[in-house]
């Protein structure tokens, strides 16, 4: 076997020296406070059983057998996409293999040469990778800073009157758990005739009536150019969809390379998406319990005097900033020794100095578990920070 080139060896060595070397670990035992399975749908027997019933309606193979433009466009896709469009109150939905594929597929294909993309500086890596593949010019604005966004819009609107301008943000940010003021953002977008693209990955299933997302909670559907909803988090399955006009769907089918040049999701994966949405549509208990647990977690933050190191968030993502890769890894190790699965988020995933513990709250976390993990954290902070 050939050796890894020396340049790559050096990059790996740098990661080790910076204490940011990543490894794959087995799924650990203990209380889950680190997965994105906010509603517990990944373990739902009802969703699994209904998936089998959906598959039995069709003569379906184990795999999709090809891309959707060839042999992979099974009838279950049409059913699921119609269901998604109806649930999310939009003209059309197009399923992609993952949220990553959806974002690189959208941003590499839709914005054109000389167009402008203004994106929140904390936008997900999949958005940033899509921007790298785009012919459009892209510029970041300060996190959730709408004044900075408007200043950039003024400048680029004056300099590029014939170009489309896209504003890109997330409804719930994956690392901080916070949200932008979407109402004001869309007022600004309308003022400058800009097109808004909202990634709803961490709002899907969690925010709004029946988890329809932040955009629908605020009744802003008609003001959005495109929404990206993903299914690997609260929905407990896999895949993603881009929501928008019928013409946008047609355009993506014709020009989005991550859609065109890949084997389609398996019919089982698509049936699971459909099954999870059927369950979500009638489910209120799981979302109610999740909201209660989030509020209890926030109350316990206050009770343990930890509010100064937590980022304010009403979402299922609660981030505790402990600066430094080594220190935050030590904090995570201490918590894990007590039987709680909480993962450190290291730089360069987040900027140096903003390393954090990322707590993910679920319907199945008990009040006792929440109280105990924050006591363990409080003891670590008292003795080490």
List the predicted regions and their residue ranges.
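Conserved PLP-binding catalytic core of the aspartate aminotransferase-like
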Residues: 41, 289-295, 306-338, 361-363
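Conserved N-terminal alpha-helix of the aminotransferase class I/II PLP-enzyme fold
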Residues: 49, 53-98
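Conserved PLP-anchoring active-site segment centered on the Schiff-base-forming lysine
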Residues: 106-125, 150
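PLP-dependent enzyme catalytic core of the Aspartate aminotransferase-like
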Residues: 45, 49-53, 86, 337-338, ...
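PLP-dependent aminotransferase class I/II
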Residues: 234-301, 308-310
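Active-site phosphate-binding strand-loop segment of PLP-dependent enzymes
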Residues: 139, 143-198
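Conserved PLP-binding active-site segment of the aspartate aminotransferase-like
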Residues: 34-40, 278, 316-325, 341-374
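Active-site PLP attachment segment
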Residues: 210, 216-251
């Amino acid at each position: 076997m050939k050796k890894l080139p020396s340049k790559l060896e050096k990059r790996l060595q740098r990661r080790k020296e910076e204490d940011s070397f990543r490894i794959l670990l087995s799924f650990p035992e203990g209380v889950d406070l680190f997965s994105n399975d906010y509603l517990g749908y990944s373990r739902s027997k009802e969703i699994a059983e209904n998936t089998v019933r959906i598959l039995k309606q069709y003569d379906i193979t184990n795999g999709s057998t090809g891309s959707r433009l060839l042999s992979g466009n099974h009838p279950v896709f049409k059913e699921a996409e119609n269901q998604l469009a109806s649930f999310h109150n939009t003209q059309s939905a197009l399923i992609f293999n993952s949220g990553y594929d959806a974002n690189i597929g959208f941003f590499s294909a839709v914005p054109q040469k000389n167009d402008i993309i203004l994106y929140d500086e904390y936008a997900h890596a999949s958005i940033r990778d899509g921007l790298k593949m785009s012919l459009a010019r892209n510029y970041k604005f300060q996190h959730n800073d709408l004044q900075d966004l408007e200043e950039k819009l003024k400048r680029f609107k004056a300099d590029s009157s014939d170009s489309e301008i896209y504003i890109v943000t997330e409804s719930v940010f994956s690392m901080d758990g916070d949200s932008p003021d979407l109402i004001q953002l869309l007022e600004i977008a309308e003022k400058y005739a800009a097109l808004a693209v909202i990634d709803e990955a961490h709002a899907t299933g969690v925010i709004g009536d029946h988890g329809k997302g932040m955009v629908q909670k605020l009744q802003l559907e008609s003001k959005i150019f495109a929404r990206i909803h993903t299914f690997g988090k609260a929905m407990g399955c896999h895949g993603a969809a881009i929501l928008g006009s019928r013409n946008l769907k047609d355009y993506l089918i014709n020009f989005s390379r991550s859609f065109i040049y890949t084997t389609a999701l398996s019919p089982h994966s698509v049936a699971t998406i459909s099954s999870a949405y059927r369950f979500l549509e009638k489910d209120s208990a799981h979302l109610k319990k999740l909201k209660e647990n989030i509020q209890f977690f926030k109350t316990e933050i206050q009770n343990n005097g930890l509010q100064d190191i937590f980022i304010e968030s009403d979402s299922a993502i609660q981030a505790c900033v402990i600066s430094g890769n080594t220190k935050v890894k030590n904090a995570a190790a201490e918590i894990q020794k007590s039987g709680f699965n909480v993962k450190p988020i290291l730089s360069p995933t987040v900027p140096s100095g903003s390393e954090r513990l990322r707590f993910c709250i679920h319907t199945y976390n008990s009040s006792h578990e929440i109280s105990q993990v924050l006591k363990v954290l409080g003891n670590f902070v008292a003795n080490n920070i």
